[in-house]
Every structure is written in C-alpha cells, then in structure tokens.
C-alpha cells in the first residue's frame, strides 16, 4: 500500500525528530575521530544531491548541478524511484550515478534506505548536498551516508524545524529569492574554502539562473508528430503540424497539494475561449494515464471538436518532443511547468498556494497569481501543508486573465516562426 503524503509528514516529525537527536551525537563523534587522522576533502570530488519528493526540483536544481560539474565534481543523485524520470530530461547526472528509494511502502522505504547508505560508502561520496527544505529523513541520510562535507539548510535561531546538527556547512534558507538561487547558495557553501556563519555571503546574479535545453531525438519528435496528426485525423480535425498551432492545456496538479488546481470548469471555459479566438488550431488536454477521467471531464464540458483528450498519449521521455512541437501551454503550478522549461515552449502558469517569486518556471513562462493576503500559504515553515480547503487564490484567476496571457505567448511564438 502506498504511503500517503500526510503519513510521510507524520513519520518525518514524530520519528524523525527523536532519530535526529539520537544520531547527531554519533555523527559528531565519528567526525571527531576521523578528523584526528584525516582532514577530509580539500574540495568536493564526488558530490551527492538529495532531493526525494519533487520532480520539478530536478529541473530547478540543474543550474546548480552544472555549476558543481564545471568545478570538477562528479555528480550523484538520490531521489524517490517514482520521480527518477525527471532526471532524464537533461541527463546532467549519469544514469549509473542515480540512487533511488521506493516510497510505495514502509518495507520498500527501509530496504532501499539501508541499500543507499551502503552504496554511498561504496562509491566514497565525499560531499553531500541536502536540497530538501528541513526534512528530517534527508538530514539523517545526509548524516549517515559517509560524506565528510555535508551541506544543507539549517534553522539557526528559528523554531519548529530542528533536524539535528549533522551538517558541517549550514546554509541560511532565503524565502525571498527564487529556489534556484537558494540551490546555487548551497553550491557556494560546498566549495567555499572558508566557513561562513551563516552561508552564503554572496550575491547570486540572475545570469547564474541558466537552464540547458533538452536534446531532442529527431526520430522521437517525428513519432510524436505522427501520433498527434493521426489522432486529429481520426477525430476529423484538419491539422498539420507547423501549419495550425498546437495548444496544450494541463488541468491537473499532483495530490501533494490539490489546492493548486484551477477548477475543471474554468479550464473548460478557457478551451472554449481559445477555440473562439483560434478556431483552426488544435488543443490537446494533457495528463498522465491516471488522469484520463479528470481530463475527459474537462474535455466533455468544453465540448469543442478541436480539443482532444491527450492524457496518457505520450511517455515521460516524449514530453520534450511534445513541448517542442507545441506553441503554448497553460498549466497549474505543477511539474509540466518546469519540464517544459527545457524546451522553447511558451507557458502560462497559474499560481495560488505557492508563489512564482520562489517557484516560478525558469523557461519562457508568464506566471499568473491573484496576490491574495493569505498567499502563499505553503512554505518550508509548514512543510507545504496548508489548512486551506477553499482555494480562493485560484478561483480569483479569471478565464479572461489567462486568455490575455495566452494571446501574448502565441503572438511571441508567431514572431519567432516568422508569421
């Protein structure tokens, strides 16, 4: 049986805090003994990143990983098995250097955790960067993986987020700058020659937030193109890729934070409005295979011939080709908003419980937020759990607002094509 998000949070708190208290002195003792004989790495050579639960973060951390790579570090990554595919979009980390943990059951979680701790020591990881925001589980993994240089976010004088004292380089988490800059701050701490309290006493310019583009396989691109044209033909829709526009609508968001969802009815109304403005263009409503019924409801309410249910029609590896063929995508604040950033696709991303100032896409994206006084209501301080059961922040975003931004993005796409 799969472990629910709330169960994970409860385990992290009620089990994680006592374990951090017990393990921290042991790790400190081991450090003290090792320091008698060796001084540890002069600079990171084998650098492990830990980010378990967020697929989008695998994209947002890529500039930081490439920064470390440019400094000569060999990269490793630990992630939940269900999220592993996100690391294949840019392939910054070698496949054989990716470790996974099965989060679908308690037994699988324990088994893979123990296996990882053995593997990390076998690979002689010398530096670990904990990317998670105050997770006790990842703090324990960081402390026990055998790395001498351990970097992560520390609460210092804050309250409620204590997770022991296993970090050797403690970084101040800044909730007022984009998460990618926070990740780059961790890289500075990992490679710094002198200890700072707190890390990182540097300025991170916007120019550092650079995202590489995915390498698109021409064969896969043609396969996706043919599949779309075949589906359109079967639905009696006149569509030729490159002639008519291809517009993507991604109406769902993960169960991790359902408050991020814009209403199904709004997406249906948006599809109707887009079709009225661009009657000859094809609209694909995307989603995973498990989201087929959710997507179908959006499609059936919209009742537009040129709008097709495309849920489950492409694999994860085929997303970059799909995005490359498309002109614009509208999505809730979820993985696709970040996955598409590795392609030239223009997006419109709807934010409510989160803020684009911290988690905005670093691609060709326009964010929309209602800027309510209560928003953002999820943060590192509450482990992204909100009491809200009425997402007015999303309800306040109108179809007209979104359509205006779609028009802007399509105009920009047309200019790029030379239309």
Residue ranges and their predicted role:
Residues 1-419:
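Catalytic machinery of carbohydrate-active enzymes
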